[in-house]
């Protein structure tokens, strides 16, 4: 359907949102959609002359009104719309005309629909023609001689008064076409041109002369006059110098490829151009030229003039702004064709591809007829043929010496080494007309750039053109080029020439994807180049051409064999195309031909059936040559001249008989048929062939089993194996007959039997004639019990684990025969020197000592745990055992004997803590000293045995801890007394040295002296750590201070109390030794040398801290009814939280 309505804008509207359309008062709008929900309609605005686009958007429906029709029209023919914007109608239909601004497409309405219709399909009413005639924008047209041109001059100043200056020349073609149609209907068939478009000769201007040759003396182009405008060649100055010309440069104006004369000062208007071309001989046609603007095809009013007498073609746009007029001679037209209302022309020098829209098919036919007469007269085929025959000379062939870049429309680009044909070298000595052989382009180039290579022989004197006239040769050549161009056009989807669609009306709703004029020109040139390149392809040698056929016998081609490369056969076809065909696709005959030509064997690429047939045929030929009659069979008639078509073997039935799945039978059958296999190859089929054909492994076993059974094949090579190895009669998983083995049964291996290991020397005796008597000495093997015979066949498992077997004691109960070996024969005794030389003496053997078997100690089982053990643990005493007293007196190094320390004694009253390790033995490396080192204190490492500590009845763990601490204090006092006694016996007193740098604090009962050399030490307090038993902290013991014996100066101060030093490790390890400076202080305090230092107080000696028991193990049981300290209370577990009774103090509600 077309438009829903044609409306005109009543008010101006500026868009307020996206998607809306700007309209002004008086704009013509085409309504596309009418909304039923709101007052916004979708419309398209008619494009003005300045704005070629037709925007689409939303407009308010109260800003527009329906446009009134401007006239009526009657349909001359039936028409069916081609696009959505067009309108269909029938013959004699009455149409309402709304817009006639486009000369070819009229906006009309018919039966409530609106759209565009072709102008030549309708006839406007008299009112419409009368209304359009006096329009002020009517452009000038060629008129009879009685109407002077000067009378139209006053119309020029009136054109600015028009509200639409750009539409001034638009209505003229429509009015002219309407007049032409009216005259054709009222009168007889029209003449060559309508009277309106055939102006008479002007009295002021002479007839248009023919195109003169370029004069040598002319250097520049003078200011053109009316009588000389059509004679301009625009290139004389360039013909005599390779440099840029002094004349104006002819520039191309995209996209219409029109020349511009702004540099020449040409300001002549359209009227002057028309007046210059009006004189007799010219047939004028007011048509439209299809040009491309912004990617769209538009129609540009143009005047086409054809002068058959002078052989001139004139093209002049209606408006001067579209470009000046251009002229070509007849020989510059290389192509013309007709397609409906379109006329296509190809012109050179300057090159231009033109698409004219004649408006009517009759007009287009008339134009093409005139162009045909013009081309025939320009070619003068008969006259040229007579002249060529009389002169006996042809065109010259030349080669380009230098690169030349065209600087004008009549020149052509050439490169060094290009081959050219010299068309004209007579008109000018410095500029020659040539045709480039590479792309068939013609133009002028400097003659100094070309070197003549010789003459070109005429094509009509030899070859297929011999005896044909030039006209017939040209006709054949044109027909061939037309066919090639048509093929290329179909291939490249280029709609040029026959079959081209009519150009549709340019619209924003209908996008066109055709190329522009320059693109069409390039495509046409490429078509010509491709046609020439195809014709210039090399052809194969006819003597070596043969027919090649593929393996399926479906395709064949005549070509020449070139080479065999990369598994492909290179062929040269008759049309010059070179192809490469895989070897596997060629027939056997072709492969044999290639083998004969190259000497390379191609048996791997041949079908297996053909190879078998060839082998059998060769064997039959050998048999026949030897006089033996060939065996009857399919190969007996291989050498016969006539072949008998035998029916194909039914492979489908064959695979069915092999128990192959029905769905796979057809696929396997096709594979065998593709390989051209028949029943003759069945005896030779093996697993490898089947795998190559794509048969599955399971089906391969079935097929091989069927063939073995059918042809009674017993060879190992017929069996199917895995990994390419033959298994002989039986395979790994199948038996001799092809049946699958049951490998799930596995028997018990036979037991090893021990034989006699005594070598019988009689077996090596030389008496070979004597045979051992059957009564021999019984061997242990003979006396061994014979195992029970097993059944050959068993049902179920072959394992005999359930069989009754003799006990092993029976076999070992008969060793007498084995312990009595046979008496060895006595060897002759060799004495004397013979014994020394003899090799028969037995070598000496060392006597091996029998190792004594040591009885391994039997591991004693740990005693059973009974309640009495736990009862006895509570009576044990805790504490550290007393160290062993050392021998008194000084111990010299000579008295340091290697002694093993005595193991600790375990008594019934020992503590729960494991006994401490013994003191370090004196055999260990010691410092060499004349005095005995202090005894090493035993250090307990690790933790005690994991035994629960159970308090006896009536006591708690707190009581036990207090008793333990008292025992430890007593033991510590005993150790200190022992140390004092040892020091007195040794004759030396230990002197504490060094400073305590870890604890600078001083106890309250210590009196500091001025020259104290060591800081007192605090008492060592063991670390108090928390235990899971919630034991109260143990009270630190208070050791008795040692009485230090000062040396040197006698001090009147009482000795300081010694305090143990904490080390920060744990209570089990002694503190680390600190380096202590010794010696006297020199006079560092600044006093004179006779200063007597005060006495040095004794240095306290650090003693090892006693060990404290650490409670380990599980918590002790809770005993009720015992008074004393608070014992550990059992903690209830496993209860469930009761949130209903939860309080801040008891959040879980227990």
Swiss-Prot record:
Gene Ontology process terms (BP): actin cortical patch assembly; endocytosis; regulation of actin filament polymerization
Domain of life: Eukaryota
Region (Disordered): 127-170, 183-257, 490-547, 605-640, 722-827, 846-930, 1026-1060, 1101-1150
Biased composition (Polar residues): 217-226, 753-776, 1140-1150
Pfam family, one: SHD1
Compositionally biased spans, kind Low complexity: 143-170, 183-195, 625-640, 813-827, 849-858, 921-930
Residues annotated as domain SH3: 2-69, 70-127, 393-455
Protein topology in the membrane: Peripheral membrane protein
Signal peptide location: none
Compositionally biased spans, kind Pro residues: 1030-1039
Entry GO MF terms: actin binding; identical protein binding; protein-macromolecule adaptor activity; ubiquitin binding
Record family assignment: Belongs to the SLA1 family.
Job of this protein: Component of the PAN1 actin cytoskeleton-regulatory complex required for the internalization of endosomes during actin-coupled endocytosis. The complex links the site of endocytosis to the cell membrane-associated actin cytoskeleton. Mediates uptake of external molecules and vacuolar degradation of plasma membrane proteins. Plays a role in the proper organization of the cell membrane-associated actin cytoskeleton and promotes its destabilization.
Subunit organization: Component of the PAN1 actin cytoskeleton-regulatory complex.
Name of the protein in question: Actin cytoskeleton-regulatory complex protein sla1
